[in-house]
A protein has these predicted regions:
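N-terminal beta1-alpha1 cap of cysteine-dependent amidohydrolase-like domains
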Residues: 1-151, 156-174, 178-193, 201-226
Length: 226
């Protein structure tokens, strides 16, 4: 059986629920995976640092110590066709990376770290989703295929999401929405033409804490061997 290396991009903290769930989620897939944590402050040369990794998972718990480090890891995965999963903070930063480097929105910012920014792509949610669960509707795509259904319930730990004012600009190309909550807010995206590039504001890895294999994580792992 093959072994796959997965880079976990994020600043590990044992007190963060999702950080305990992520390795468990990978183990529950039944595939031999070696996860390696990358503190964002240590990311300086993605081309060499991630060359031997089969996939990259940008994990929750942001703001990160080094925003640019996280963004460079995401860009590497996007441009090099490496399977990529972003959850919670990883979702926010996947949107930032795409906005800046593909859409030309070079000033795109996260209001959590730059509340006075002119272009607040990531903005406060109307209602905080700290330790809450919510329903979402899935469209055809990676998420819908992974879950095998059009409506799901997943857990969150966040207060910031996509500013709806920028949806038209952000989703005019290959990046598309594949999950929305019942109010129509974006909760999941994927990149067309990429082997596997998916990001969700929710934290699918939390299912592992109940002994369940998270469907989206299983799909990500399957892409490692494709």
């Amino acid at each position: 059986m093959s072994n796959y290396n997965v880079a976990l991009v994020g600043d590990f903290n044992v007190s963060v629920i999702a950080h305990n769930a992520v390795p468990q989620a990978l183990r529950l897939t039944g595939i031999d995976i070696t996860p390696v944590w990358f503190h964002t402050s240590a990311i300086s040369d993605p081309e060499s640092q991630f060359a031997d990794f089969d996939g990259i998972w940008c994990v929750p718990a942001s703001p990160y110590a080094n925003t640019e480090g996280a963004l460079s890891a995401i860009r590497y995965a996007r441009e090099r066709g490496r399977p990529f999963l972003g959850t919670c903070g990883g979702f926010q930063h996947a949107l930032l990376e795409y906005a800046r480097n593909v859409c030309g929105l070079h000033q795109a910012a996260n209001a959590e770290t730059d509340p006075g920014a002119a272009l607040r792509l990531i903005a406060p949610l109307a209602c905080s989703l700290i330790e809450k669960s919510d329903d979402m509707l899935l469209t055809d795509g990676l998420l819908g295929q992974a879950y095998g259904q059009s409506r799901i319930t997943e857990g969150y730990h966040c207060s910031y999401g996509l500013n709806r004012d920028y949806e038209a600009l952000l989703f005019s190309g290959d990046l598309r929405v594949t999950a929305r909550d019942l109010a129509g807010e974006v909760r999941g995206v994927e990149l067309s033409g990429h082997p596997f590039f998916a990001a969700t504001l929710f934290q699918p890895e939390r299912r592992a804490l109940r002994g369940e294999t998270p469907p989206l994580v299983a799909a990500f792992v399957s892409a490692l061997a494709a």
